Curated annotation (Swiss-Prot):
GO BP: translation
Species: Methylobacterium nodulans (strain LMG 21967 / CNCM I-2342 / ORS 2060)
Gene3D superfamilies reported for this sequence: Ribosomal protein S20 (1.20.58.110)
Function: Binds directly to 16S ribosomal RNA.
Pfam family of the protein (one): Ribosomal_S20p
InterPro entries for the chain: Ribosomal_bS20, Ribosomal_bS20_sf
Keyword RNA-binding part of the UniProt annotation: yes
Entry's Gene Ontology molecular function annotations: small ribosomal subunit rRNA binding; structural constituent of ribosome
Family: Belongs to the bacterial ribosomal protein bS20 family.
GO CC term, one of those recorded: cytosol
Protein name: Small ribosomal subunit protein bS20
Amino acid sequence: MANTVSAKKMTRKIAKRTAINRSRRSRMRTFMRKVEEAIASGDAANALAALRSAEPEIMRASQKGIVHKNTASRKVSRLAARVKALQA
């Protein structure tokens, strides 16, 4: 348990930041799940639309430090490849 005033404040700040990060991570995963569901249903147009909305969310999460830049790029790349294969 935090004893000093500054330690207590840091505990509050960490809790606040954790909640924000959890929300952003959840939002990113929701957008990715929409792409996955569109791919699973076989709807190429819907999958492409979902990918176009998911890509900025994933990259925004990387800019905010939720995921590493390379991880975000890898996720976008793999989703894009699956959507492209669906269109072919």
